[in-house]
Every structure is written in structure tokens, then in C-alpha cells.
Amino acid sequence: MSIFTPTNQIRLTNVAVVRMKRAGKRFEIACYKNKVVGWRSGVEKDLDEVLQTHSVFVNVSKGQVAKKEDLISAFGTDDQTEICKQILTKGEVQVSDKERHTQLEQMFRDIATIVADKCVNPETKRPYTVILIERAMKDIHYSVKPNKSTKQQALEVIKQLKEKMKIERAHMRLRFILPVNEGKKLKEKLKPLIKVIESEDYGQQLEIVCLIDPGCFREVDELIKKETKGKGSLEVLSLKDVEEGDEKFE
């Protein structure tokens, strides 16, 4: 894969370049295409799957390797693997206009897919299609931010779409099983976090089936654990308040 020419040059092909400017100098690393995003999102954890070589360059396309003294001056070390990690995490990915356009289009689709998966029409309780969400995103002129995760941007899109259409995050259906002694008192504390109580069953234990906003799940879970000292249980029944067989809303 690598052809060594003079000792300070390494030739590489099919490269994604990540660049960082430091101490007035330019430093670059050579990565495999489509691997940088995986590393930054935490999906890819094996550095060797991301880097084509652990060398630090001043110019990847020309194969010019950075000098040891320049690395020490800029990074305080000549440990090239550690420097590669810094550049990989904080550097700027160099892509062609065509590649950038393709990446932004893919991110746009990914954001729309997340929104469609997480949301429903509050009146019909039915989900929207990805195509309809994409159309709505274009109508509000949503601009993809390449340095923010698709999940973060999906939340932004939901907020903006709420101003233009009937949309809300799908409710999460939960079942609580609580000790009777603490159950009634705990139910009052849970009420502000519950959207709808679908059923209550008082027997040897208090069993409640309800709908909540997914954003409240952690708070509900922690409250039950704390108040029941681990004796209560929480079960996720479904992630969407949608009946099986509902058609998607075009």
C-alpha cells in the first residue's frame, strides 16, 4: 500500500486527509475514507482501522513527513501515534466539493430518518415518512452542520418543525411495578413526568402502565430506584405511541 521514496516521503492512495495548524505550521495525517466520522462518534475504536500510517505529514499528497523538531515544537512530543490522535480528534477533514456534497446529502437523509423514527403526528398518533420529513426540512431551509452529530441535529429539526407542522416526539410506553407502601406516594412524584396513565392495578404491588416523553426516561428511572431503594421495577413496553398496523402518514 505504501511506497517509500526518499526517507522523508511516503506515497499513499485513497486517502482522507485530516489537517491541523499548530505553532505556525501545517500538520496532516492520512486516514481511510469514511473512517474519521466513525472514530469521532465513538463507533470505531481501533486506531489502525482509521489511520493508513501512524506518520505525521506536512503534506500528505506529496508524501512529505513532518520533522521531529517541528513535532516537538508544536505538540511537546514526538510520539507520532499520540499526535495522530490529537489531529484525528480536533483537526479539519479535507474533502473535495463533490465528497462534501455527498456527505451533507447523506447526513440530511440520516437526520430525516431519525426524526421520522422518533416522532408522530400528535392528532393521529401516526408516524411520518422519511420523504415527508425531508420535504419539510427543505421547506424550512434546514442547513446541515457537518461538525454536529445527526442526533443533535435531529433534535434541532424537531423544534423547528414544530413551528410549521403538527409533530411531536413519540411517547414511550412504560410499566412500573412498585411496592404498595411506597407506590401511592411515588405515583404523586411521578405524575408531572407522565403524559397519560393507561392503567393502574392495585394488588400485592402497584402496577402502572403509562406514556412519557422519552426525554424524561432517565429522571423517571432514577426516581423509582431512589424512592423504592431498588425494590421497584421499570419496563419499557414500546418506544412509540403507535398501534401496530397503523399506516405511515404521507
From Swiss-Prot:
One of its GO terms (cellular component) is nucleolus. The keyword rRNA processing does not apply. It comes from the Eukaryota. Gene3D superfamilies: 3.30.70.240, Ribosome maturation protein SBDS, N-terminal domain, SBDS protein C-terminal domain, subdomain 1. Signal peptide: none annotated. Keywords: Acetylation, Cytoplasm, Cytoskeleton, Nucleus, Phosphoprotein, Ribosome biogenesis. It is found in: Cytoplasm; Nucleus, Nucleolus; Nucleus, Nucleoplasm; Cytoplasm, Cytoskeleton, Spindle. The modification Phosphoserine is found at S238. GO terms for molecular function: microtubule binding; ribosome binding; rRNA binding. The modification N-acetylserine is found at S2. Associates with the 60S ribosomal subunit. Interacts with NPM1, RPA1 and PRKDC. May interact with NIP7. Interacts with CLN3. Belongs to the SDO1/SBDS family. Required for the assembly of mature ribosomes and ribosome biogenesis. Together with EFL1, triggers the GTP-dependent release of EIF6 from 60S pre-ribosomes in the cytoplasm, thereby activating ribosomes for translation competence by allowing 80S ribosome assembly and facilitating EIF6 recycling to the nucleus, where it is required for 60S rRNA processing and nuclear export. Required for normal levels of protein synthesis. May play a role in cellular stress resistance. May play a role in cellular response to DNA damage. May play a role in cell proliferation. This is Ribosome maturation protein SBDS.
